[in-house]
Structures are given as C-alpha cells and as structure tokens.
Amino acid sequence: MADLKTNLLGFTMNSPIIGASGTVGYGVEYEELADFAKIGGISGKGLTLHGQYGNKGERLWETPSGLINSIGLQNPGVQHFIDVELGEMLELKQKYGTVAIANLGGHSEEEYVEGAAMLSDSAVDIVELNISCPNVKVGGMAYGVKAEAAGEVVRMVRDACKKPLMVKLSPQAENIPEMCKAVEAAGADAISLTNTFQACAIDLEKRRPVFNNTFAGLSGPAIRPIALRMVW
C-alpha cells in the first residue's frame, strides 16, 4: 500500500484526508464506521465562544448530487469543547494519529479573539478559523466576503493565538486570490477551501423555501469541480 503520509503545519498525518468540519462531528461518532488509520485529521464541528442551539425548522435537504444544510452552527461552546469533546479527539489521535483541529466561528471580532485565546491555551493541534460567519456590526455580511474584513479578523486572532492557524474561506468571497493574499499577510499559516456554497431548495407542495432562513449551505459532489477551480 502506498505511503500517503504528509505534513501539515508541522504535524505528520497518515494521509492528506481530513474529515471536514460539520461532517464527522468530533470524530468519535464515526470511529466504528471509518478506518481512522487512513485519515490524516479531524476538523471538529464548528464552535462559537458560547454554545448555540442552531436553526429551527428543516435542517437537511438532499439534492441529486449533494446535501443542503441549515444547521446554524449548533455547538456546545468553546469551553465545553475544551473540557469534553477535545479529550475525545485527542484519544482518537492517540489511537490512530489523527490531528485534532478546532474549527472556530464568531459573530464579532471580540468573540473570535476570546475563543481563539482559549483554544490557544488548550491541547488542540490546529485552529481552523471559519470566516463565513456574519459580522453583526456591518449588517450581517460575512467576514469572508471582503478581503479587508477578513484580513482584520485574522490579524486579531493571530495576535491572540499561538497555535498553527488555518483560515477556511467562503466561496462567496468577492475575489478568492485577493482573499488568500489578505489572510496570509494577516498571519494565516494555511488556507482551507472551501466552505459550503449558498443554495436554496423549494418545497413544491407548499410553494415556499424549505429552510426558515431561505438560503443554506450546499456540499457534496456537486461543488467539487467548483472548489477545485478555486484551489487551482
């Protein structure tokens, strides 16, 4: 069998495959379903400083070539993650060598910074910054849309976090190459592409959008060629 070991930010991984945030929980939920010895790392379910219940109404909708989700960043909060779920991820790392990655979102610069500082003092290996979250100070526009806003929040988090910092970009960014340069200049050690693509589903019987928020995130085979274009 081919040796697929690779290095990510100083960590040797079994393979280049990382369980994407939001798809594998915190890893332990899928331990009996997947061969973790072939997985390089786990990016845990997206966190916010304080726990969130997530969105009401329909949350998942299958498409012919993917899945649309409207979970709403349901999570236990950073401190609960450090106290409970991180330990489970580190147990998986001890068993299989999977790198433990914490995915962090926020609704203000202050939330990002405080959450990052807490994770910086924890045993997590890498912090993945989710900048697709809405900035409540500018009418809800995601941090990941404009390079200037993205660079600013990454710069603030970089100052507060000594862990290797990966920034997960939104495909809704105005200009992906400019965004990459902005977050790199602000201190990002790596870039993750991409988050889900904004999508919509219609309930034909009710003649209205499936999701309470109208739009939700599309993932799956349908977005792979588009994501690869962005990487290229």
Predicted regions and their residues:
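Alpha/beta enzyme core
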Residues: 95, 107-232
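N-terminal capping/small domains of soluble enzymes
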Residues: 1-100, 105-110
